[in-house]
Amino acid sequence: MPVTPQQPSGHTEGLPEPTAEAAVWVVIPCGPCIPIMLGLASLTAFFIITTAVLAERLFRRPQPDPSQRAPTLVWRPGGELWIEPTSSARERSEDWYGSSMPLLMDRAPGPPTPGGTLEGRATAPPATSAPYSSLSSLVPQTPPEVPAQSTFWRPQTQEERPHDTSLVSWVGSEPMPEAGLQVGSPRPWRPRQGSLEPDWGLQPRVTLEQISAFWKREGRTSVGF
């Protein structure tokens, strides 16, 4: 009986062999995948942005408000604790010279009361008689010379102060000038009690208009002293 030749079980040329993977990709449609991927991407972006915002607020250094910041404390010579000003030089000068009440009472005391004190009345010289007063009223009196006003206030010298024995001075006597100083030379500055800072007794007579004109002329808005 003749034997019929069997075909080889190997791959046959020209005939594509269908595989299981190709059948799976062909069967599953790709239409629903696109909206699902877009939804997942949107959710991921939302979580990333939220995490970045929370981290920025958590780790950001708070910026202090310049109007409410604490003053700077500085130790000066002599063991004094000073507070550095936070405003500009123009604001401080306008506040200083524009205030209605004096900020410093470093000036001469006001005129005494007409009656005076009991000690003043007791030590007062006897009053002059009436004829002498009538004669003095007939004599023309020259007005006293008024010294020219200075920009700075200074205490009156011994020659300029009127010597009145009927008044009792309550201000302490000033120290006498040293022997080594010449007459007319400026007095050396005196340190304040318990400090090395000088005690400046001169206070300028400057109005608020002059201060504003000075800053307008200088053209400076904020300069630190």
Swiss-Prot record:
Phosphoserine modification, residue list: S195
Span list, region Disordered: 106-163, 178-200
GO cellular component: membrane
Recorded superkingdom: Eukaryota
InterPro entries the record matches: DUF4689 (IPR031499)
Residue positions where Phosphothreonine is found in the record: T113, T117
Membrane topology: Single-pass membrane protein
Keywords (A to Z) from UniProt: Membrane, Phosphoprotein, Transmembrane, Transmembrane helix
Feature: compositional bias, Low complexity: 122-140
Transmembrane regions listed in the UniProt entry: 32-52
Nucleus keyword on record: no
Compartments (UniProt record): Membrane
Main subcellular localisation: membrane
Official protein name in the record: Transmembrane protein C16orf54 homolog
Annotated source species: Mus musculus (Mouse)
